[in-house]
Amino acid sequence: MEYRVTATAGASPAQVYRLFIDVERWPELTQSMRSVRRLDDGPIRVGSEATVRQPRLPPARWRVTELEPDRRFTWETSGGGVTTVGDHLVEPDGPGSKITLALRMSGPLSGVMGLLMGGIARRYAAMELEGFRSAADAAAPPAPSAPPAG
């Protein structure tokens, strides 16, 4: 089972990627996160872990599995017969970026979990996408204005 949401932002891919990897800031960007606490120090890297607390969900320990600077941040968590992968992708789109968030569930109980939690997963993905888009747009330099007609 997979959920995918996409939006465009005026910020560069590098600006969006910085938001992706600043996981402890995520609760400032979206109400779908109560807290994110890194379990290691230093720059985020493959193998880094964090405890994520979200409304209506049990706390989950997420481990970074893939980093492509200025492009992709992927992490996963497992429990209760389900492995969940969260993929955060940013691509150039004209002067700005295309942001894609995907959530994939697999494992013996993923179908049942999808039925029980699919609505929450879709809502939270949309909230998180809007949080990243809004924060990226706020950080983007203003678009150049057109010269006066004359």
What are these language model-derived features?
Residues S48-P55, F73-G79:
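Short beta-strand segments that buttress and anchor functional surface loops
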Residues M1-G42, D137, P147-G150:
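Hydrophobic ligand-binding cavity/cleft-lining segments
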Residues M1-T6, E49, P59, R72, ...:
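Intrinsic-disorder/low-complexity, polar/charged segments enriched in Ser/Thr/Lys/Arg/Asp/Glu/Gln
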Residues R104-G150:
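A conserved amphipathic terminal alpha-helix motif
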Residues S78-V82, A102-P108:
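Short, solvent-exposed aromatic-acidic interface loops
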Residues V5-A7, R61-E66, T77, T84-P92:
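Hydrophobic/aromatic beta-strand elements that line small-molecule binding cavities or substrate pockets
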Residues P13-A14, D41, E66-D70, L89-K98:
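A short, structured loop/turn motif at beta-sheet edges
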Residues A11, R56-P58, M105-L109:
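Beta-strand elements of well-folded, non-transmembrane domains
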